[in-house]
Amino acid sequence: SNAGLWGYEIGDVVRFVSVDPYRIIVVGRTKHFISAFGEHVIGEEVEYSLQQACQEFSVSVREFTVAPRVSKDQEKSCHEWFIEFDQPPADLHAFAQRVDSYLQQKNVYYKDLISGSILSPLQIQVVPKGGFINYMRSIGKLGGQNKVPRLSNDRVIADVLISFTSFN
């Protein structure tokens, strides 16, 4: 029955996996996106891109979040990824290139902004182990019911996480 759907908070993005019978899976939240430059990147695309690169480089991620970085000088704007790895990849630059490549495959608007030299490819900031826990503790939201948003269309989380990264 559809009784369970009435308990859903509006804002979930769902995908139908079957129409007979009707079956859906939750693939994200409408408020978790980045479109600071018109790219309309959603959580499903980001998670896919990161997962593929992690498999390719044999690394695992504890936690991550992504935010836009709007440049105020000659440098182009980009997406800034804050990632806490179990063990970082040996070649972080190559890893970032693969994540970016997968994201371009999934999102044509993002690809157009990169190929049109509007945006620079994404940049990764490595968050030391425990960095996200420290962040959640610092905002009073440490606990199982609270999660770090994967995507933010602003820099509220990113600006705090900068102080926890190994590359300031």
Spans of model-derived segments:
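AMP-binding adenylation
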Residues: S1-N168
